[in-house]
């Protein structure tokens, strides 16, 4: 027995000693950032991957709250009151998501930048290497732009983080802006003017100029900053590479996403295997139209109604609907019957009795004129539901002034309704009619980050602040003529005496509502 025990103990000892070598893993096929970005294919995929990071931001729900929501042109949905009563703190999930997304992407940019700056990559010629570096610096600058606008002093890592770091050091606002300018100026000098069709979506020299114009306009530390803002915007305008499309209806046609007006866009695809979470913005501006009428149900054409952002009464008041085509082109304010046949009992303002109404597919069912109508106007379209501005509810509802079987002689017809946080005319810029079914979340619409109409308005702002109101009016009029109802182009034009910062802000709201600019516009103009 003693001999057996000695043999057993010896065997276990040998096993323990040999197990150390047995458990040591040699990672012959392990891929790390360090070696992946040192090949031509690896660094090419790395740069392309930086564009994919932009999908993590454009347009997620949190970005809407950060860039559009807390402003004069939007009213928020219940459950997101923090954004509209200015009680945001570090526990807010949207803020955390924004912060995490930006810094995760910055770190990815830094890894690519470090590899490009420090490695001789076989097969990668100097021109392509420089272009890759310019693209990477632009995207990093874009994230820093968002971060410094939202938070002021921020951590500004310029090297990749490869291990856990438990402390962070803030960089002063001025230093962050200086780095953004440095990166964007490098991009302007080294990005191409155009790409092959197969590389559509990559950042061009003119996209970088547009971004620099916005940055210098934001800084406006001196007359020289304003001069640079105007110069960069005018270089884009005069390049001959871009032109305004004919109308907003054409601009927002989802089948026209690679149009002549777009300077830079984040790309999505209908291929579900490649689209990831997709573009979900189609849900957030859409009202709950399917909850108001028995014959109107969810359909792809009208969108998936998550009701997150409602345009304010002030925003709607900015549109002269008689001569500004942007109202009809950019908003849904009329809904047709979506069902084949629905029978409803409705109270008639004519007979003062309940009558049977058979709704048929395609006929008009609801209108939100976003302005007061008289009882006579509402009666004329009966039984179509008419949604009056919400403030009118206080004047009418408490008086029981809407007709019904119990109240047949009330002043307001039975088809009178009121807008609410759930039901309203809504923006169509993000709707996605190419989704395979109505509840499909992962949209495929491209996001237009920069477009030429914005460039014209940046140029107008820079010109006005430089003392040239005439030039500002000329640039604004280019945008307004395109926006005119046909035949009203001359009426849409303004004079130099009309130009003020407030007018420019109003025009930016009319033109760019819902495109992730509003809060930065208000912040820039105080």
What are these regions (language model features)?
Residues 1-29:
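Bacterial Sec-dependent N-terminal signal peptides
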Residues 39-40, 44-57, 78-151, 171-178, ...:
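Conserved, well-structured interaction surfaces
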């Amino acid at each position: 027995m003693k001999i057996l025990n000695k043999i057993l103990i010896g065997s276990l000892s040998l096993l323990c000693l040999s197990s150390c070598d047995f458990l040591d893993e040699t990672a012959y096929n392990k891929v790390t950032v360090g070696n992946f970005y040192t090949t031509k294919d690896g660094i090419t995929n790395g740069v392309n991957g930086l564009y994919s990071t932009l999908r993590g931001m454009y347009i997620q729900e949190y970005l809407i709250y950060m860039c559009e929501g807390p402003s004069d042109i939007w009213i928020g949905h219940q459950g997101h009151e923090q954004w509209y009563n200015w009680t945001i703190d570090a526990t807010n999930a949207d803020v955390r998501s924004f912060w995490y997304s930006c810094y995760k992407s910055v770190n990815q940019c830094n890894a690519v930048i470090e590899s490009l700056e420090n490695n001789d990559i076989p097969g990668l010629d100097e021109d392509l290497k420089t272009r890759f570096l310019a693209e990477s610096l632009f995207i990093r600058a874009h994230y820093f732009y968002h971060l410094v606008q939202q938070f002021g002093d921020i951590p500004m890592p310029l090297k990749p983080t490869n291990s856990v770091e438990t402390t962070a050091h803030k960089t002063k606002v001025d230093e962050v802006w200086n780095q953004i300018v440095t990166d964007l100026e490098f991009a302007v000098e080294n990005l191409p003017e155009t790409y092959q069709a197969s590389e559509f979506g990559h950042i061009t020299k003119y996209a970088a100029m547009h971004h620099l114009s916005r940055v210098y306009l934001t800084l406006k530390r001196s007359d020289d900053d304003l001069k640079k803002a105007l110069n960069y915007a005018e270089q884009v305008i005069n390049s001959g590479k871009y032109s305004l499309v004919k109308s907003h209806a054409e601009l927002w046609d989802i089948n026209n996403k690679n149009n002549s007006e777009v300077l830079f866009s984040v790309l999505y695809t209908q291929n579900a295997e490649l689209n990831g979470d997709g573009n979900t913005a189609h849900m957030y501006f859409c009202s709950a139209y399917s909850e108001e009428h028995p014959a109107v149900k969810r359909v792809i054409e009208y969108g998936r109604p998550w009701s997150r952002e409602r345009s304010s009464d002030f925003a709607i008041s900015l549109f002269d609907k008689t001569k500004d085509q942007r109202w009809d082109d950019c908003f849904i304010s009329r809904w047709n019957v979506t069902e084949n046949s629905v029978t409803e009992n409705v109270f008639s303002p004519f007979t003062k009795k309940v009558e049977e109404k058979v709704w048929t597919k395609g006929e008009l069912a609801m209108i939100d004129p976003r302005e007061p109508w008289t009882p006579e106007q509402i009666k004329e379209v009966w039984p179509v539901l008419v949604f009056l501005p919400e403030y009118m509810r206080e004047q009418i509802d408490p008086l029981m002034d809407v007709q019904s079987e119990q109240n047949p002689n009330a002043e307001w017809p039975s088809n009178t309704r009121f807008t609410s946080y759930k039901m309203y005319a809504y923006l169509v810029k993000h709707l996605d009619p190419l989704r395979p079914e109505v509840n499909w979340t992962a949209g495929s619409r491209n996001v237009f980050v920069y477009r030429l109409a914005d460039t014209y308005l940046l140029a107008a702002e820079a010109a006005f602040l430089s003392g040239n109101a005439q030039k500002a009016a000329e640039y604004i009029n280019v945008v307004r003529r395109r926006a005119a109802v046909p035949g009203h182009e001359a009426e849409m034009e303004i004079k130099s005496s009309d130009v003020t910062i407030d007018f420019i802000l109003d025009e930016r709201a009319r033109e760019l509502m819902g495109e992730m600019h509003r809060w930065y516009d208000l912040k820039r103009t105080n």
